[in-house]
Every structure is written in C-alpha cells, then in structure tokens.
Amino acid sequence: MASSNLLTLALFLVLLTHANSSNDASFNVETFNKTNLILQGDATVSSEGHLLLTNVKGNEEDSMGRAFYSAPIQINDRTIDNLASFSTNFTFRINAKNIENSAYGLAFALVPVGSRPKLKGRYLGLFNTTNYDRDAHTVAVVFDTVSNRIEIDVNSIRPIATESCNFGHNNGEKAEVRITYDSPKNDLRVSLLYPSSEEKCHVSATVPLEKEVEDWVSVGFSATSGSKKETTETHNVLSWSFSSNFINFKGKKSERSNILLNKIL
C-alpha cells in the first residue's frame, strides 16, 4: 500500500513539474505607460498613451528609439525541448516629412534580455553589422520605408523574406498588423492592413527560433529616422497585444515524461 502511494506521488510530481516548466505569457496594452515598458534612446510615451519611438522634438534628425515590454518572455524550454508559439497584434502610424525621400522604418523584434541599442540608420537600432551575426540573437519584422516593403530579418539586416508594401502612399495612416509564429512548423507570418486604403501586405518565412534567439527574450519595437531633415519621419505605436503558449512540441514533452516515469517504475 505504501509503495502504491509513493508511486502515485511520484507520478503527480513528474506531471506537475513538466506542466509548469514552461511559461506562457499574455498582455494587452490599449494605452501605453512608462511603468510597463523599457524605453531606450528617444522613445517616450505621449500624454494620449501612444508610444513615440522617434522624433520626440519634431523632425529630429538621426533619431532612434526602442521600447520593450518590461517582463522577459520565454520562447524556448530546453529542459523538455519545447518551443513557444506566439501571436501579436499592434497598430502603428508612420508619418514622413517627405514621402519621396523618407527613412528608415519601424520593426517589431525579439532581442536578448538586457539588450542595448545598436547602430542607427538602416540598422534600426537592432544590429551592428550587415552580415549574419549569430551572436545578435535577434529576429525582427521590419516595415522598411526606404524600400517600401516588409522584411523578416534574422540576425542580419539582410532579409530572408520580403514583400512590397506602399508605406509612402499610406503616409500618416494607421496600420493594423498581426504576426503569428507556429512553433511546430517554425512558420513566421506577417499580415498588415491599412483600413483607409484597404491595402493588404503579407510575408512569411521559416524561422527556427530555438536556433536564432535566446531562450528568454524581450519583445517590442525599434525605429530609426533619416540623418537629414528631408528624410525624417515619426514612428508611433498606438496599441499592442501579445500572447505566447507552449504546446506539446513534436511530442518531445510526452516522451521525456515517459522516460522519467519508466525510471520510477
């Protein structure tokens, strides 16, 4: 009888340990405030509760701002080979002084916890080199106003996937963005809609996040503006929600639990 009780307790502890070993995350920001953000560079929050990434003084040259959610997000649990899926929705407005000569754009990014701003300009405050740099541990979805396209960048400003999107035509208009990551398929998908013009843009790529970013990341935004008055633009994020969850990735969680149970039995 005692042996049976011990076995039941052992089973419970194994299942409890693995049920709680990964950390799901969820938040919804309808109005930004400085208490739930890590602000870097020129980034600030307006009195209306909007996230202002660049040009806080108005048409500021060579401006750069980054803002990340204050709590780290777990992407990978190596103890059970479990990778998180996630989805994020946000709205933004980019306003260029001269739509024929604007720079550089805005990005949603996963960066290392404690990351500091990188180079300005086309590097968007996220990278220090043009070439692939595995040590960057950064994956970004870039809304590139120079090339008028959406990019998926993995540890480099050289994109692994692009799709044209006319930011100039929609200058100053609100954009609605949804990004999803399906961990079993390593599938990263981006959808953008401008309600005012009904223009839609889509891009996707295969990104094995467990190889490209650290297990815990900071999620948020980065933007840079041009180095001359005629190339300046503002980048404002109006709302943001994010949700991540761990699923039974390729059956490995169950396999590991079974191994542990077999050892007990």
Swiss-Prot record:
Top-rank taxon, per record: Eukaryota
Protease in keyword set: no
Single GO MF descriptor: nutrient reservoir activity
Signal peptide (residue range): 1-21
UniProt keyword list: Disulfide bond, Glycoprotein, Lectin, Plant defense, Seed storage protein, Signal, Storage protein, Toxin
Keyword Glycoprotein: yes
SUPFAM superfamilies: Concanavalin A-like lectins/glucanases
Glycosylation site positions: 33, 89, 128
BP GO annotations: defense response
Disulphide bridges, residue numbers: 165-201
Gene3D superfamilies assigned: 2.60.120.200
Biological role stated in the UniProt entry: Seed storage. This carbohydrate-binding lectin has toxic effects on an important bean bruchid pest, Z.subfasciatus. Antibiosis properties of legume lectins are proposed to be due to the lysis of epithelial cells of the intestine by binding to the carbohydrate moieties of these proteins.
Family indicated by similarity: Belongs to the leguminous lectin family.
Self-association state and partner proteins as the record states: Homodimer.
Protein name as it appears in the record: Arcelin-1
Organism for this UniProt entry: Phaseolus vulgaris (Kidney bean)
